[in-house]
Amino acid sequence: MISIIIAYATPEKQVEIPLTVEESCTLVVAVKRSGILQQFPEINLSQAIVGIHNKRTALDAGLRDGDRIEIYRPLTMDPKQARLLRAKRGKIRRMVRGEAG
C-alpha cells in the first residue's frame, strides 16, 4: 500500500484528501476513490488537467508513495490580461499612498 494526497482548490477553498491505495493504483482510480468528484461536481475528470507534484500527468499514470495528485481548474482569465490588471492595481495603490511610480 502507498500513501498519496489528492488536491484541488477553488478561489474560496483548498482541499487535500489523504488516501492509501494499492501500489498498482492509477491516478484516475485514486481520484475516483477519494470522493473529491462528489465534493466538487464541477470537476469533469475526462477534460481536467491533472498532475503529480506540479508536473502534468496522464490519467492512466501509475502512482508512488508520497505522490500529491493535483486537479487543475481551467484558467478564468488570460494570463497576460491578469498581469496587466495586477500591474494597474499596483500603480493605483502607489498613487493613493503618494509613492512615485
Swiss-Prot record:
Pfam families (alphabetical): Ub-RnfH (PF03658)
| Top-level division of the source organism's lineage | Bacteria
Transmembrane stretches in the record are: none
Name the family. Belongs to the UPF0125 (RnfH) family.
Q: Entry's PANTHER family?
A: UPF0125 PROTEIN RATB
Q: Could you tell me which HAMAP family the record lists for this protein? A: UPF0125_RnfH (MF_00460)
Q: What is this protein called?
A: UPF0125 protein CBU_1303
